[in-house]
């Protein structure tokens, strides 16, 4: 029997984000793969890239395939930069570059750690945020009151490209398959 293991954040641990009559991602996957596959969800809502190491500590010994979706919460952790004063666009780009460099080190290390398990591994990038259609409760602590949701959406999508570029570079550098969540 094949055994799929999901690692990451709320992309896979999304029970609290779906309606009671809807299937979460692990159960959708179970319904698609049938009885020939076992599905284990080690993903945890709120986790960031550095938490994957802890999730791997619980990797079942019979795991045959890994799927990773992480990085969005790493980006959310930097939303406060949107409120920092800057003098030039160049200065803003440099700040984003430095955030990206830190993320790249953590993400690259995480992938190397995952690959030590010698299992077929597929990776998801970060989907576009949808602040305009969801509650802003998760992000209010990062932003000043009275935020314009349209501007927040635009800024987050622009900043997200840095994280997704790093994810895609690190994934393709290792010849791993990528699932682009932006088009789903």
Enumerate the language-model features and the residues they cover:
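Structural beta-sheet core signal
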Residues: 6, 68, 123-125
